[in-house]
């Protein structure tokens, strides 16, 4: 209860969002979770579900007080079904542990959001995805079934179309207590290609041109040179090109190709190399050894953490826009950020349209906080104008809910009335 509650239960990774629960209930089974929710429903007490607390949108923060239902101890692998190629797990197991278990069995769990220490339940609650969504899709595509606790404390097993009422609902419609995940065969061979370009527009035009062809890349990643340079300086391990032949690179495209064997991957690489002049890239750099591939991904995965450690103030805006609108969104965010005295940098998963826009400053915290609130309204407004979604990969939480449109609010209200009429599950989040 209150006096013994640690600070970790009062926040996630979203800056400026905090809340103090009245109690924390750590559970290890569906039955225990159901009992807690039933008691809270009868008493009208809010329930905020929490996994690892790695969210970026305030989704697991108890902004309305009440009870934090911690699922972190529900971290067991329950069953591997070899015939169905599925893995049944509890929600508190970490993404990296699910991936390792699949790897151990010679299989592959594709969803690959940046935070590997997030829980698998949190991934399902936000429908997390990552760079390889262009080929493999999102978490939703790899959930065969769920066991959930509804807002009245009843339990239910869901599959097929019924999963839509829970996956991506951010703990506002049900508590996920068990997941059966689909595993697939591992890619047998792969390689990474880097394409530096003089500017963002040329880079993204090339990305869309390559996507239109029959190469089926697993990753098509846009990286602007500002973020490449900033991150490389912070980590002391610059990997991606910043200059070529004395000229500053504008942006780099990272492409991952997969195939049945090395020869099939090489064939794709050779076909793409023939397009170098057409797509106006400055060069093509190849990563086809385990060491090079690890270095490329380590440099890419350092973007987020380097913002936090390399600047006095940092914030991220995570959105999704149509692939053909990414260049316009990048230029808009940079211009608006610059007008406010902020340095704005970006990278994006081109195939799925997922964007990570970072703003940093070494100014005063209060001034930065005011500026990034203004910038958020501009970025989210532009995102909607371009036909995108502010949900992105991190969800809405409480950080973005004020920017949702009337249509999204109405749709959510109808679901909330159906599944949680008392409004006890994760109040103040998503469209609540």
Report the location of each language-model feature.
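Conserved, mostly hydrophobic/aromatic
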Residues: 40, 171, 357, 420
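C-terminal substrate-recognition/cap domain of FAD-linked oxidoreductases
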Residues: 4-11, 181, 185, 194-375, ...
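Activity-critical C-terminal alpha-helical subdomain
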Residues: 400-432
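Glycine-rich N-terminal segment of FAD-binding domains in flavoprotein oxidoreductases
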Residues: 5, 11-74, 349, 383
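FAD-binding subdomain of flavoenzyme oxidoreductases
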Residues: 76-83, 87-221, 425-426
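Alpha-helix capping/hinge segments and adjacent helical runs
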Residues: 384-396, 421-425
